[in-house]
């Protein structure tokens, strides 16, 4: 007797970039919430966060990532967080994992290279991102904690930051733009917000 129809599980591949704990925790929490009867989940995370992913009911794979301390140093100086060479290496690592798991959909948290990697494999891509980076709203990001902010009055620093923010956004987008050009993908308009938010839709 036929008791039901066996449906294929949706294969979801999560990329948890190792920049900060938050970038690992968010994909991890989402992966845990997916019903294992409906979803075939794989979570890729840097080996440094292995203690967070023991004893889970889905597959865990190591992910090549820039060291968190390097990310923190660049963030403190207001420098672009990833250079072209790093992102190019990320694409190679991404493609190897995508080819290994053959997902139906990819979910990434601050894995900027997925703007390219997912496109090269024609796989739907969902980007996890803070809402204030949405290009659908006016550019008004919160003042980051930079190395020099402790030495100047916050109102003055905020005033300066608001005026240079559009230029800083373009500067931070340059490595991703160069990466997309290398692989023949269209420009995101030198807008860093689109590198983290709407790259999932392009």
Indicate where each model-derived feature is located.
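Conserved nucleotide-sugar phosphate-binding/catalytic loop shared by glycosyltransferases and other
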Residues: 9, 18, 36-37, 41-85
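Residues that mark the start of a beta-strand
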Residues: 11-13
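A short, glycine/small-residue-rich beta-strand->loop->alpha-helix junction that serves as a flexible
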Residues: 16-28
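Hydrophobic/aromatic ligand-binding patch that stacks against planar heteroaromatic rings
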Residues: 33, 52, 116-117
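Short, hydrophobic beta-strand segments that form beta-sheet elements in well-ordered domains
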Residues: 40-45, 105-108, 187, 201-202
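Conserved nucleotide-sugar donor-binding subdomain of glycosyltransferases
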Residues: 74-113, 163-192
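Conserved nucleotide-sugar donor-interacting segment of glycosyltransferase catalytic cores
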Residues: 89-153
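Active-site-proximal region of nucleotide-activated glycan assembly enzymes
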Residues: 126-202
């Amino acid at each position: 007797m036929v008791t039901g129809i066996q449906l294929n599980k949706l294969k979801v591949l999560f990329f948890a970039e190792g920049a900060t704990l938050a970038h690992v925790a968010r994909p991890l929490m989402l992966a845990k919430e997916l019903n294992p009867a409906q979803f075939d989940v794989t979570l890729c995370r840097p080996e440094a966060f292995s203690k967070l992913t023991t004893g889970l009911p889905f597959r865990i794979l190591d992910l090549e990532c820039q060291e968190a301390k390097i990310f923190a140093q660049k963030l403190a100086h207001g420098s672009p967080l990833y250079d072209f060479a790093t992102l190019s290496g990320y694409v190679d690592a991404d493609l190897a994992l995508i080819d290994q798991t053959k997902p139906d959909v990819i979910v990434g948290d601050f894995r900027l290279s997925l703007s390219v990697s997912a496109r090269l494999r024609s796989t739907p891509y969902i980007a996890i991102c803070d809402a204030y980076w949405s290009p659908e709203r006016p550019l008004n990001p919160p003042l980051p904690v930079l190395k020099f902010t402790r030495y100047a009055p916050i109102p003055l620093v905020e005033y300066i930051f608001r005026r240079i923010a559009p230029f800083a956004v373009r500067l931070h987008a340059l490595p991703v733009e160069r990466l997309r050009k290398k692989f023949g993908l269209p420009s995101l308009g030198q807008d860093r917000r689109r590198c983290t938010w709407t790259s999932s839709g392009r």
